[in-house]
């Protein structure tokens, strides 16, 4: 797999015992090997590099992420800038940004938005694990920077439902425990949402 297939060290270790290894770079995957693209997706350049190595590619990119890749391509072809609301260093965001040849930006804070140049038009999308209220808040600021913004709330519906359930439970609970991988964006967002309501969140 190109990168850990899941944010769960125990599962990754078990898969390694079955001969399924994780590689951080395309160069670390043997030429002609079977290569799995995980749900985060990859950039066009990375996908092309796997093909050039003669790999048998199994594309497990999440359909919601693949849809954002298509939006990035469309923005590029139309000459529009692409703004992704999310964590710039997250593999999902890096993959999305790699599907446009035009201007591209990743923003996560108000300061990030303030640094954006003024532009005539842009396509705005979100990381699939983004908190919707935060996305809307930043989009309101982005609209002051972009004359003709094309906004798409590309948050995964399952993620949105989990976040709502988390805040509903946190409002009634004395203690909240979020069970998930420390490297998981989903787990971090659930923790942050719960902690803002229930101080005893772990």
Please report, for each region that a protein language model flagged, where it lies by residue.
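The feature marks the mature, well-folded catalytic cores of soluble enzymes
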Residues: 1-202
């Amino acid at each position: 797999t190109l990168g850990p297939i899941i944010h769960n060290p125990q599962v990754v270790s078990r898969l390694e015992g079955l001969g399924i290894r994780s590689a951080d770079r395309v160069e670390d995957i043997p030429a002609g090997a079977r290569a799995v693209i995980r749900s985060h997706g990859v950039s066009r350049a990375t996908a092309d590099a796997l093909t050039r190595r003669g790999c048998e590619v199994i594309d497990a990119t999440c359909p919601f992420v693949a849809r954002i890749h298509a939006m990035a391509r469309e923005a590029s072809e139309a000459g529009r800038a692409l703004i992704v609301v999310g964590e710039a260093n997250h593999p999902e965001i890096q993959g999305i940004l790699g599907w446009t040849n035009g201007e591209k930006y990743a923003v996560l804070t108000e300061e990030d938005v303030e640094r954006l140049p003024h532009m005539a038009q842009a396509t705005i999308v979100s990381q699939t694990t983004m908190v919707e209220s935060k996305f809307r808040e930043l989009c309101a600021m982005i609209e002051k920077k972009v004359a003709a913004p094309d906004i798409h709330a590309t948050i995964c519906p399952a993620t949105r439902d989990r976040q709502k359930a988390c805040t509903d439970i946190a409002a009634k609970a004395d203690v909240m425990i979020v069970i998930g991988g420390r490297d998981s964006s989903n787990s971090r967002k659930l923790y942050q949402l719960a902690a803002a309501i229930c101080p005893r969140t772990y």
